[in-house]
């Protein structure tokens, strides 16, 4: 969902919803990899029934990762995707269902955002190439050093769109992967696997929600099914709440801000391309022996417990003395609806509502104030009561003027504080050019800050040595420039791997021009004139914008609770109206057009692709994007404006692209449809979901019999054979059958010669037109035990926050007291000294452990290694004066001191007294 910072706001406001995943790792014995046994109980101390994968959130980081080298070719990409799924399966360990959903053709309402994102990606790619070429030339002219430019084909991530050859190949690879795992992995033997590839219309997460909704409506559904959905989009939280399932958990990668990214020219971290000076790479180790050996920190996962979020919301939304009965489930639906106003994938957010300014808290406060007047809830089962919504919007509209003025004041205060900070930094630079660093650096009296945790011994030791070398070199250089004096002003020879600009340079960045000036009188007139090019007195136009936005609110809520109400509807403007414009909206919406159909895959490609990605389309189709004689050439501008809309960065702005006219697009494509090959026609057709299972599953014999009798009629699934799951089965056109070899589409992987899996087409159970899925707790649903404690309601109560590991709040977790943390502060120095010992040519001892890569150590003395799992033992041991080193056995890449406490056991190394 297009709500920047939504998850950050949510996790800060409701911190107990987050649980860190416990992940068992496979082992290696004599060069043989031993995988994790996923048949064993889940180490997170919870058992999940169904795991749903929003596959696009997996495909993108596996094909073009940001924090490690990209795969060399498509085969490596497929293997990376398989490994990612394996890792998630290992953490979650579903016992009934694995559902993999790839984005298919999206509703027209989503295509606006998809089009903007793909045009931006193409534009940024061209600008990046130009910038790299320009900066490279400048650096070389100044005598800088840059590694030779690699000539390699750039991976166009736009190919991750339905209808491309890449997505078709991915579907084939996933079919192979599922067959291989069902045949060879014991943890898969009793689960049903659903694959909804890119040929099936719908966004991945909404195909998953549609599956859950339709299964909930069946009489055999288990109301206490424990769902786990994988995905990083913020809208998954709202979608999970909208199911009203009591046991719903989301798993996602843990977001770590400010992760270093290598420069695209020199490959070093700490600066961007525009600031590259072509400095030679420093040696990693005395003889560069550590170059290319530093392992990248593995991405960690977290759980988001929606049952705990429901606890928070129950406390926040409960209202007394209402003129109608309080219904918590209805209030949750209203909360989800109010979140739409701060942004989503289908509508721009209202100008006065910014998530970073506490917009949701403001809306909830207004909601609770006016609910006595509204006489009821805002929504019911995905349908909106517009008369009540208008009262909320009018209350927001009254405050709009103050909101805009406060926003301006906050911005000015922020700039003022930054300016003062830069002045302080400049004053500090006037001090001595050489200061003692490390353990002998001066510290303020009484400072009790805990030291950083050791993340990777070898890596950090190298960093320490490089930093101390650089400090010494800079100090010497400054003293020489200053004629031997020990103090000097700021030097131009600052470290090129740090901040590349002087502190004052940021003042020279031009402020984006804001012609609207929402904080000044006349803001509404200027807004409509600048954004819509109409006079603010044009009431008919403003009403048209509001009506479209109201339709959008109704469409989005229906999409979340009932499915796609219209494949054709979309919001036809780049900007939203003001809250104060929502007047007399009760009769602005009646219903959507019935029986609309989605685009076909190649048609959607024509609607969302820029001309630069035309190579993924048939030749005559791509000519429509570039030929001057094309009747739709105006859909594909080579360049386009980006309106910052009051923001600072281009990625936050609004891409001013022309909207695609569906009628004109279809008319132009009618002339080139006959040019499609049979393969292109197949890729342009709509497909269906496929169900897979292994030989030991109770449903296996039933499906095998369908193939034996060649039954072409749809057959209902016997619910008793499949955990209550219902739907219709049809024979697959290219089936995976037992005893048939499944060929590997990836050359580096082996064929499945003794396949025991079987696959069949699957269709969700149908419902009559006009059927309404009830947004309620199902009969028999058991509410999970409450998790929150009284202290969890007090924010900033002074207690140290410790993240929970796994679902058991009473899990034994080792932690260190203050003396232990002080000892950890000297780990860097200790390892630094070990690694820098000049080893003789005699026999060297290798110290190996899973926490850190092996490195040579001169045997100075013998060490005794003790492993403790008792908190009491650790506290005692940490106080022992002979402690040399303490660090975590597991999760050594943890990034903050607070994270240390969640890992056990702890490794303590003492010098032996023998």
Write out the residue ranges for each language-model feature.
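Low-complexity, intrinsically disordered or signal/transmembrane-proximal segments
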Residues: 828-830, 849, 861, 873, ...
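Intrinsically disordered, low-complexity terminal segments enriched in Ser/Thr
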Residues: 827-834, 841-846, 865-869
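Ala/Thr-enriched low-complexity intrinsically disordered regions
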Residues: 839, 862, 867-869, 876-877, ...
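Noncatalytic, typically N-terminal accessory segments of nucleic acid-processing enzymes
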Residues: 1-827
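Compositionally biased, intrinsically disordered low-complexity segments enriched in Pro/Arg/Gln/His
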Residues: 879, 902, 908-911
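Low-complexity, intrinsically disordered segments with a bias for serine/threonine
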Residues: 54, 844, 854, 874, ...
């Amino acid at each position: 969902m297009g709500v920047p910072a939504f998850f950050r706001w949510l996790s800060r406001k409701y911190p107990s919803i987050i649980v860190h995943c416990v992940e068992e790792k496979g082992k290696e014995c004599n060069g043989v990899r031993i995988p994790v046994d996923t048949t064993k109980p889940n180490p997170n101390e919870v058992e999940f029934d169904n795991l749903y994968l929003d596959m696009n959130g997996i495909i993108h980081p596996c094909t073009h990762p940001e924090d490690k080298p990209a795969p060399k070719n498509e085969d490596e990409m497929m293997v990376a995707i398989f490994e990612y799924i394996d890792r998630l399966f290992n953490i979650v360990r579903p016992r009934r269902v694995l559902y993999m959903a790839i984005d298919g053709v999206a509703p027209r309402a989503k295509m606006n955002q998809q089009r903007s994102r793909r045009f931006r990606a193409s534009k940024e790619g061209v600008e990046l190439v130009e910038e790299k070429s320009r900066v490279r030339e400048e650096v070389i002219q100044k005598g800088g050093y840059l590694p030779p430019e690699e000539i390699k084909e750039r991976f166009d991530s736009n190919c991750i769109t339905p209808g491309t050859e890449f997505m078709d190949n991915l579907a084939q690879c996933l079919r192979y992967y599922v067959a291989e795992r069902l045949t060879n992995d014991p943890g898969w033997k009793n689960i049903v696997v659903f694959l909804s590839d890119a040929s099936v219309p719908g966004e991945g997460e909404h195909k998953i929600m549609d599956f859950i909704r339709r299964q909930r409506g069946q009489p055999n559904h288990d109301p206490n099914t424990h769902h786990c959905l994988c995905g990083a989009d913020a809208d998954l939280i709202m979608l999970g709440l909208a199911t009203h399932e009591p046991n719903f958990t989301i798993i996602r990668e843990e977001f770590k801000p400010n992760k270093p990214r290598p420069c695209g020219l020199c490959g070093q971290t700490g600066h961007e391309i525009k600031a590259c000076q072509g400095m030679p790479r420093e040696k990693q180790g005395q003889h560069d022996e550590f170059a290319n050996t530093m392992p990248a920190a593995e991405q960690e996962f977290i759980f988001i417990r929606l049952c705990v979020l429901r606890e928070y919301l129950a406390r926040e939304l409960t209202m007394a003395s209402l003129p109608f009965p309080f219904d918590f489930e209805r209030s949750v639906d209203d909360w989800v609806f109010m979140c739409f106003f701060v942004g989503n994938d289908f509508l721009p957010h209202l100008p006065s509502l910014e998530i970073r300014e506490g917009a949701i808290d403001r809306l909830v406060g207004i909601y609770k104030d006016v609910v006595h007047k509204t006489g009821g809830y805002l929504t019911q089962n995905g349908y909106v009561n517009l008369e009540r919504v208008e009262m909320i919007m009018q209350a927001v509209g009254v405050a709009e003027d103050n909101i805009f003025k406060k926003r301006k004041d906050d911005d000015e205060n922020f700039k003022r504080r930054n300016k003062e900070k830069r002045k302080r930094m400049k004053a500090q630079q006037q001090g001595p050019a050489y200061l003692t660093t490390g353990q002998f650096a001066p510290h303020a009296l009484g400072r009790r800050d805990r030291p950083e945790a050791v993340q990777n011994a070898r890596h950090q030791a190298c960093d320490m040595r490089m930093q101390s070398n650089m400090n010494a070199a800079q100090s010497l250089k400054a003293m020489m420039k200053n004629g031997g004096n020990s103090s000097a002003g700021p030097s131009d020879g600052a470290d090129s791997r740090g901040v590349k600009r002087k502190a004052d340079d940021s003042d020279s960045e031009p402020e984006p021009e804001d012609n609207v000036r929402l904080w000044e009188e006349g803001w509404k007139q200027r807004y409509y004139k600048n954004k819509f090019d109409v006079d603010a007195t044009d009431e008919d136009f403003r009403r048209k914008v509001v009506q479209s936005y109201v339709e959008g609110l109704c469409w989005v809520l229906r999409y979340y609770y009932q499915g796609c109400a219209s494949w054709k509807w979309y919001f036809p403007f780049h900007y939203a109206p003001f809250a104060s414009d929502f007047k007399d909206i009760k009769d602005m919406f009646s219903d959507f057009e019935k029986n609309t159909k989605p685009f076909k895959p190649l048609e959607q490609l024509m609607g969302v692709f820029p001309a630069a990605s035309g190579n993924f389309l048939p030749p005559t189709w791509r000519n429509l994007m570039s030929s001057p004689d094309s009747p739709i050439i105006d859909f594909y501008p080579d360049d386009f404006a980006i309106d910052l809309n009051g923001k600072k960065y281009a990625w936050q702005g609004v891409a001013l692209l022309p909207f695609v006219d569906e009628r004109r697009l279809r008319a132009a494509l009618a002339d080139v449809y006959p040019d499609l090959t049979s393969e292109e026609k197949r890729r342009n057709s709509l497909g269906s979901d496929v169900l897979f299972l292994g030989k030991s599953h109770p449903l296996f014999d039933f499906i095998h019999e369908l193939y034996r009798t060649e039954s072409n009629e749809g057959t209902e699934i016997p619910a008793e054979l499949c955990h209550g799951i219902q739907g219709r089965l049809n024979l697959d056109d290219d089936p995976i059958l037992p005893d048939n070899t499944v060929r590997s589409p990836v050359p580096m992987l082996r064929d499945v010669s003794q396949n025991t899996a079987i696959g069949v087409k699957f269709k969700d159970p149908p419902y009559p037109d006009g059927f309404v899925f009830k947004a309620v707790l199902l009969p028999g649903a058991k509410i999970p035990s409450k998790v929150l404690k009284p202290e969890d309601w007090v924010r900033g109560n002074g207690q140290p926050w410790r993240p929970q590991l796994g679902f058991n709040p009473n899990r034994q977790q080792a932690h260190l007291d203050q003396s232990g943390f002080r000892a950890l502060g000297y780990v860097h120095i200790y390892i630094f000294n070990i690694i820098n010992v000049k080893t003789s040519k005699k026999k060297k001892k290798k110290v190996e452990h899973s926490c850190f890569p092996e490195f040579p150590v001169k045997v100075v003395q013998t060490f005794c290694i003790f492993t403790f799992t008792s908190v009491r033992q650790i506290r005692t041991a940490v106080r022992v004066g002979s402690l040399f080193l303490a660090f975590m056995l597991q999760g050594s890449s943890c990034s903050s001191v607070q994270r240390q406490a969640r890992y056990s056991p702890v490794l303590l190394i003492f010098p032996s007294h023998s």
